[in-house]
């Protein structure tokens, strides 16, 4: 028997377990890494500050709740750029519902000849059977902008082409023939519909979304060369060669 602490919003395993047993989900830490208001002596203090941990131990001891304390060395995640300490943090994200495509992907996998053969039901097959919904949005500057615009009331527009973007733009001149559809230029395009203004959400797509779109994007599908894809002339591929890491 034993006891282990859990922090629902600050670790994947913690979050999944919390969902299973119905633990409440709320944040005690803000995006800047400091504790939220209402956390007594922790309020506005940095969660990674060593003195904060010491003060928590002192508080537990003062209230007669401390069983034991011990220092031990362990690994801890840091930002590879600035070397700052980082924490896991549950946030809202945009997902693709891959779990709804699981059965179709498994059926498609049956028609593929794999070399080596064991990957079909092994490494790749197991990944397909356990496929998770894909959190594909990223909070980065560079990347394919998520084509979603949002109004203040939460209403959203998903734009499917430059032509549609131009037709909805408050200032159509921003979407000329030579406009740059990347950040920061696309962020300045305001859309108007039903008397409401829409601002683009700041997220970009995971670069693997771009990679997955390659078979279609190289032909400018669906705006051109539709027959190559729709009639199976250029998709799916007859042969694909990948490194082992591409089989997940």
Regions found by a protein language model. Give the residues of each.
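Residue patterns forming the tRNA-binding/recognition surfaces of aminoacyl-tRNA synthetases
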Residues: 2-162, 179-181, 246-247
